[in-house]
């Protein structure tokens, strides 16, 4: 029985690392609030779903609805009202952009932007764009 415990722990660690690798990992520790953590998790889910979609179909999804059932993207996630944030998605077969803009800017609610590069950009007091600083 004791010889099984290290093997089980190793298996759990391997599976956990595999899941993190597939999902892009947890939201960055730089989130300033739960709202930001949820929003960054949503962005990572969309970025991952777009990578999977492109690998499968040879182009990016042109709408959030097209991503449903790709990766872990659900039908409910296609709704652009994300609580404290509003989602703006612009998709073409060759590229896409995703913005999450807080309904009310605050020190713990910044705006985020990402595109097909997979890099997340941030702004403190205005909507983030492709020219905004990278999230660190």
Briefly describe each language-model feature range.
Residues 21-22:
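Boundary of Sec targeting at the N-terminus
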Residues 1-9:
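Bacterial N-terminal signal peptides that target proteins for export
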Residues 25-34, 41, 45-109, 114-117, ...:
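Extracellular/periplasmic head regions of type IV pilus-like filament subunits
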Residues 8-18:
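Bacterial N-terminal signal peptides
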Residues 131-133:
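Short, Lys/Arg- and Gly-enriched loop/turn segments at beta-strand edges
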